[in-house]
Each structure stands twice: as structure tokens, then as C-alpha cells.
């Protein structure tokens, strides 16, 4: 991940909120925000364990998530948002369907009054895995352009 050339464009009013990404873009998104004190939600699956350990090495705070422990996870994430931190999560969840927003990120944005940001990523050289999300693995030394846009604005409780 060190060899990736990431160009990040953010709005002028970019501030703490929920960093929403598609599951296929986990690697690029993680590389872009390493060492930035971001709190992320990671699946309790075996794949999630691998990703959680890697994210901790990149100085992310990790909360493991599942349908059965939802209230505990939400409390941790809400606390981070209240403390002016970013929270990251895959909008389409750990199992898809791909590119369809699950309700958790929308609810968290409304409950916290924080904006929900969307990662829009363009890759240089990469390959895709054959899975539900077509997971993208950028090749070493490739350029990645990430633009962050509003999905839901701040104070969207209406």
C-alpha cells in the first residue's frame, strides 16, 4: 500500500462524519486514510478478521460488527462521531448486494447529525476478484484518484 500514489480531493467544508465506501474499494480507501485517527466498522467474519488486523497496523480503531451486536457497535461509533472523529464503513455491507446502500450508515448519519461522505474512486492499473463485490486490488505504483462527495449533508434528521 505504500507504493500507491493516492490523490485525494475533498470539499472545502470536509469535516468529521461517516466515510462511506463500497466494499470493492476497501484497499484504496484504507490506504487513503491510514494514520488519520479513523474508527472503522469491520465484519465479524473470517475475512473481516484479516482486514481488522491489517487496519490496526495502519492505526485505525476497529469495532467488529454483526447483526446480533448492533447496539454495542453503534454506541462505539456514535461516541467517536461525538468526539469529532471520522467513522468508516462499507455502505453495501460485508455481503452485498454490491453498490446498494444498507440502512445502517444512513441511520448513523441521521442519529449523529454528521454528514455521510461518499468515496468516488478511479483506479490506474488494477485487477478485480470474481466475487459478489468485484473487489479491486490496485497494482503497485499505480495512481488512484479519490474524490469525496456528500451522500447526506450534516444535520439531516428531517
What spans do the regions from the language model cover?
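Membrane-anchoring hydrophobic helices of lipid-metabolizing enzymes
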Residues: 1-34, 60, 135, 139-146
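Catalytic-site beta-strand/loop segments enriched in glycine and acidic/polar residues
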Residues: 77-108, 112
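Extended, non-globular alpha-helical segments
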Residues: 56-70, 74-81, 150-153
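Amphipathic alpha-helical interface surfaces
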Residues: 47, 51, 70-73, 77, ...
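Catalytic core of membrane glycerolipid acyltransferases/transacylases, capturing the structured
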Residues: 16-69, 112, 124-129
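Generic beta-sheet signal
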Residues: 65, 90, 118-121
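A cross-family acyltransferase "interaction/gating" segment
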Residues: 100-157
